[in-house]
Amino acid sequence: MASAFSAFRVSLSRISPFRDTRFSYPATLALAHTKRIMCNSSHSVSPSPSPSDFSSSSSSSSSSPSTFSLMETSENARWRPMCLYYTHGKCTKMDDPAHLEIFNHDCSKELRVAAADLERKKSQEFNFFLVIDLEGKVEILEFPILIVDAKTMEVVDLFHRFVRPTKMSEQAINKYIEGKYGELGVDRVWHDTAIPFKQVVEEFEVWLAEHDLWDKDTDWGLNDAAFVTCGNWDIKTKIPEQCVVSNINLPPYFMEWINLKDVYLNFYGREARGMVSMMRQCGIKLMGSHHLGIDDTKNITRVVQRMLSEGAVLKLTARRSKSNMRNVEFLFKNRIK
C-alpha cells in the first residue's frame, strides 16, 4: 500500500468539475467568507512551552515554535479559503482567474512541511493518519477528512462532504443551516452540495478503497491507518448516533481511533481541552473559520504535523469492544475525561 503514496499527490486534481451554472461561487459569498476568515486569522497565539516526551527522550523533543516551519513558507504568505464547490467536485470556475485568485483549490500547499521538520520525527505504528472533525449537533452537517502521510507528514488527499439531515423538516434545516453556516458565508454552497449521510458513507468507502485504506472484506479497522480526532465525540458518539438516524449499520472502520487530546496530554505533560487551546499552547496561528469543519480539520492537521515534528508517537487511544460495540475501551491511563 505504501507504494501507492510514494510520491506526494493530492487526488482532487483528478476531479473534472461539473459544468452546471448552479454551482458558480458568487463573488459576494467569496467576499463574506474571506472577510470572516481574515477576522479569525488575526488571532495571535502564545509560544509553546518545551514538550516533555513521554515515550523516551523528553529533553530531545523540546523546541520553540519557530523551529517548525509549516506556516513560514511562501505559499502561506496569503492564506485563501478553500473553494467548497471544488471539494465536492462541482467547481465551474477553474478557468476563471478572479476565482482562482480568491479561492484555494489545493490545501496541500498551506500544509507543507520543510525537510528540517522531519529530523526529530519518530517511527509511527501507522503509515497514514485520517484527521476528522465533524460538524453538527442534531445530525451531522459536515464530514471532512484529510489523509496525512506519517513518514513525510504531507497531506495526501482530502474528502469533504456537506451532509443533509434525514429526520428534519426543510424549515428546520433552513433555520439550522442559516444559523450554523450563514454567518460563515457558506450556507448557499451547503444547500447546493449537501447529500444524505448514507450517500456520504458510500462515497467515502469508494475513496478509502481508492487509497487502499479499506476493503469490504475487512470486518475491523483500516489498512495501516488510523483516524485522528480532537476528542472522542466524533467517532465514539456522533457517528453511531447518525447511523441509527440514517438506518445504516455502523461501518467496521469506525472501531478505533486516536484522540489527539490524550496523546497531547501525555506528550507535552499539559492539558488542552480543544483545538484552539492546543494551537495557542503550541504557538500555531488559527487559520480559517472556527467551526467550519474543513478549516478545523486543517488546523488539527497542523497540530498533528507539529507534534510529529517534535517526536510524538500517535498511538490508538480508544477501541470498541467486538462483543458489544457500545462499549469503548480507553487505552491511555492518563487521559482527558
Curated annotation (Swiss-Prot):
Keywords: Exonuclease, Hydrolase, Magnesium, Metal-binding, Nuclease. The keyword Cytoplasm does not apply. GO terms for cellular component: mitochondrion. Residues 129-304 form the Exonuclease domain. One of its GO terms (biological process) is regulatory ncRNA-mediated post-transcriptional gene silencing. InterPro entries: 3-5_Exoribonuclease (IPR051274), ERI-1_3'hExo-like (IPR047201), Exonuclease_RNaseT/DNA_pol3 (IPR013520), RNaseH-like_sf (IPR012337), RNaseH_sf (IPR036397). This is Uncharacterized exonuclease domain-containing protein At3g15140. It comes from Arabidopsis thaliana (Mouse-ear cress).
